[in-house]
Amino acid sequence: MGIKFLEVIKPFCAVLPEIQKPERKIQFREKVLWTAITLFIFLVCCQIPLFGIMSSDSADPFYWMRVILASNRGTLMELGISPIVTSGLIMQLLAGAKIIEVGDTPKDRALFNGAQKLFGMIITIGQAIVYVMTGMYGDPAEMGAGICLLIIIQLFVAGLIVLLLDELLQKGYGLGSGISLFIATNICETIVWKAFSPTTINTGRGTEFEGAVIALFHLLATRTDKVRALREAFYRQNLPNLMNLIATVFVFAVVIYFQGFRVDLPIKSARYRGQYSSYPIKLFYTSNIPIILQSALVSNLYVISQMLSVRFSGNFLVNLLGQWADVSGGGPARSYPVGGLCYYLSPPESMGAIFEDPVHVVVYIIFMLGSCAFFSKTWIEVSGSSAKDVAKQLKEQQMVMRGHRDTSMVHELNRYIPTAAAFGGLCIGALSVLADFLGAIGSGTGILLAVTIIYQYFEIFVKEQAEVGGMGALFF
């Protein structure tokens, strides 16, 4: 019997800032406007540097996670969406393990969302303190207590802004969710930048452009040996190359292809004779949720490992969790796990690394597939998309499955939904691993998130278009 945890935190949820639900139907044009405003605020916060930081030039321990967590180093968006996703991860695991009870009522759902927001704010403060005290912005002793507190307040306010922007879209004022919007924007921005960046970097081969496409034309124009120039443009190390770009496009195409896989269950109206329809169960039943939660798990493990490494360097247990080394070739300095649990849960750094340490590869594949399948399976129980919830929705709409009674509908849906959730999560994990091994820009997880989010927005657009009757009616 789980404890009634939601009732305990109810008084705290009442004092949290909240976006009110719209009192009227929001038109598509208004939704586009609110979505654009939300995105603009996020992008502005990504460019405003934190006041009071002494230095952010040290190796970045979260370089590999920033694209996925929509964060930008040394700015108000330092934490990105990490606190929201982490609070969602914790609440989901607690509900999935039946440690807390979440009923089917709207009241319980609202309390669950309130608890998630409360945890998000607590995690924001916790992460801000960890970032400051581990010396990411300079030695705390040199900065002084006042400046340290000021940085923590800035990060907390920025985290609160992200929470409210996400809630604004989720309540129906905009399209999709803030988390999805910020992730997709960050990943697409990274891909475009890595492809067309005009920034020059001094390497052992001379001065080169960071952007893969610009580097191709630059190498062909400046090198006398054109074949060697082409080889460099396609396979150069530590900088974006054309093979990375091709891999990115390939993964985009594969994920879009798999988005169309689904099983249509025949349903009919219990009220009107001859009214038939179908209920689609997609292969990616839980969409990108498994990969977002898996990223949150890994990023928090990185935070803990980095924090302990700074404070207790050389300790056996700390090294068992993760050993870190600085990498500076071809871009900003960043920390990368070279040992311990964090190393085995991170993707191989290059194709060569796959053959150098096959144990790392095997552990990484098992972790990705297992965690994505697990998160996908548990997510349906707390998100209102389990077989029992779907059967209840169909019953409310007075729809029944053809050839089945009301009582057997849950049993029939149970044959498909949990399997689709687990197998879909497994496929998401497998595609992410494939993208990592192919060297796709923005990491396999990032590409997968970008494609699934863009596809979600495409589906929203098509649905809105069908409701208002044509493209012209959407905007005019």
From Swiss-Prot:
Keywords recorded for this protein, A-Z: Endoplasmic reticulum, Membrane, Protein transport, Translocation, Transmembrane, Transmembrane helix, Transport
Topology feature Cytoplasmic, residues: 1-33, 97-117, 166-172, 262-288, 376-420, 463-476
GO annotation, biological process: post-translational protein targeting to membrane, translocation; SRP-dependent cotranslational protein targeting to membrane, translocation
Subcellular localization, as worded in the UniProt entry: Endoplasmic reticulum membrane
Transmembrane segments: 34-53, 77-96, 118-138, 145-165, 173-193, 241-261, 289-309, 355-375, 421-441, 446-462
InterPro entries from the UniProt entry: SecY/SEC61-alpha (IPR002208), SecY_CS (IPR030659), SecY_dom_sf (IPR023201), Translocon_Sec61/SecY_plug_dom (IPR019561)
GO cellular component: Sec61 translocon complex
GO molecular function, one term: protein transmembrane transporter activity
Keyword Transmembrane attributed: yes
Major localization listed first in the record, in broad terms: endoplasmic reticulum
NCBIfam families reported for this sequence: 3a0501s007 (TIGR00967), PRK08568.1-5 (NF006341)
Subunit and interaction comment: The SEC61 channel-forming translocon complex consists of channel-forming core components SEC61A1, SEC61B and SEC61G and different auxiliary components such as SEC62 and SEC63.
Protein name per UniProt: Protein transport protein Sec61 subunit alpha isoform 2
Organism: Homo sapiens
Lineage: Eukaryota, Metazoa, Chordata, Craniata, Vertebrata
Gene: SEC61A2
